[in-house]
């Protein structure tokens, strides 16, 4: 079975009875791939992470996400996981990038607010750091 077929089968078993479509959401500098799942019934979209276990262990990602959450940073909620297959179902934080949001000219103070939020999150993560943990 191809990897994408495995992902679809896992998602179908995780969300029984929900018809969904998958579309590429983004990529990062690893072997992980991300897909946005949209649902026929209009339920909120979700992000599905595919991290092939022979190339990428999702446990460090889960650990860092929890540390960031504990520090007050806005991170996706883990809704379901299959560590053996390397699949995670996550809340969807949206498709707007920071750059796109910064280019929005409807509010002259928007950039200042976005930068303040980002710096606040970075400071919170820094203050929550502990040697050997975060």
What do these predicted regions represent?
Residues 1, 23-24, 54:
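Short, N-terminal intrinsically disordered low-complexity segments that are rich in Pro/Gly
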Residues 1-20:
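Juxta-kinase regulatory segment immediately upstream of eukaryotic protein kinase catalytic domains
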Residues 2-5, 28, 59, 116:
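Conserved phosphate-coordination/catalytic loops
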Residues 6, 30-31, 111:
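A general marker of short, structured functional hotspots
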Residues 11, 24, 78:
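Short, flexible, glycine/charge-rich loop motifs used to bind or transfer phosphoryl groups or to couple energy/partner
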Residues 20-35:
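ATP-binding glycine-rich phosphate-binding loop
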Residues 35-134:
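ATP-binding pocket architecture of kinase catalytic cores
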